[in-house]
């Protein structure tokens, strides 16, 4: 008989993810440590992280081991304009990961160094390696560098997302052009004032095959979408 409790298994997931984890990752990794034998195991997991004092909620759907709160990574202070831009970029990446996690699908980011709200952003994703959905060289040379990728339930990329705070849009378009034959949408997230630059790049002949699938969204839109989705998810879970 398996003597590992639900809380023990949750604790193991967090210990192997540097002391914290989003709920979606806990669901995914849980069975490495205990079988999901109950009728509604995911609801039981939710109940345990909310009630067991071993765990502390540190963000929406993100929980940490209470005894290790002092060991969580710390954000560096903003001292330069570069630091400010990096903080904005990491905030957007974090929101984009959370949005797809709330939809219970898989998320990926290549960035291992950025921290937001004392959480390493990549540890909020549900996968660390891109599934081999196409030729290896396309993934290794281009796709793995995309800021955020949302995968569907079949492990194909549903959306490729680039956060363009100050960099040229062209690099993002070139990455996305590599998988033009897939049914994937391409999102560019940037300040409103950069939309003209986005449209200019999108309308170049080199990107004619993907231009209709490329969408520009502002930082304000992502923030509002995130907050509304968070509230809707709370209401849905109370039904």
What is each of the regions a protein language model found here?
Residues 1-6, 31-79:
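Charged low-complexity interaction tracts in eukaryotic proteins
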Residues 18, 38, 59-61, 94, ...:
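Cationic, amphipathic, low-complexity alpha-helical segments enriched
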Residues 80-85, 101, 109-155, 227-237:
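Active-site metal-binding core of divalent-cation-utilizing nuclease and nuclease-like domains
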Residues 45, 73-110:
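Nuclease catalytic cores
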Residues 1-24, 29, 33:
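Positively charged, polyanion-binding regions of nucleic-acid-associated proteins
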Residues 121-126, 130, 193-239:
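Domain-level recognition of nuclease-like catalytic cores that cleave nucleotide substrates
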Residues 135-146, 152-220:
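Catalytic cores of nucleic-acid endonucleases
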Residues 15, 101, 180:
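Anion (oxyanion) recognition and catalysis
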């Amino acid at each position: 008989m398996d003597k590992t409790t639900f809380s023990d298994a949750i604790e193991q997931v967090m210990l192997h993810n540097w002391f914290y984890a989003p709920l979606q990752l806990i669901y995914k990794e849980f069975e490495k440590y205990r079988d999901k034998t109950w009728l509604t195991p995911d609801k039981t997991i939710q109940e345990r992280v909310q009630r067991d004092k071993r765990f502390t909620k540190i963000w929406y759907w993100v929980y940490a081991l209470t005894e290790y709160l002092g060991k969580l990574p710390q954000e560096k202070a903003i001292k330069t304009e570069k630091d400010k831009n990096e903080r904005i970029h990491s905030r957007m990446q974090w929101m984009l990961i959370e949005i797809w996690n709330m939809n219970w699908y898989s998320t990926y980011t290549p960035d291992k160094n950025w921290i937001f709200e004392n959480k390493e952003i990549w540890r909020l994703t549900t996968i660390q390696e891109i599934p081999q959905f196409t030729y290896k060289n396309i993934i290794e040379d281009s796709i793995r560098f995309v800021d955020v990728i949302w995968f569907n339930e079949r492990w194909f990329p549903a959306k490729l997302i680039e956060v363009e705070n100050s960099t040229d849009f062209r690099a993002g378009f070139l990455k996305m052009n590599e998988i033009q034959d897939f049914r994937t949408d391409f999102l560019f997230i940037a300040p409103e004032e950069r939309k003209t630059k986005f449209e200019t790049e999108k309308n170049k002949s080199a990107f004619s095959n993907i231009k209709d699938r490329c969408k520009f969204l502002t930082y304000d839109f992502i923030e509002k979408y995130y907050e509304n989705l968070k509230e809707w998810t709370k209401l849905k879970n109370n039904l």
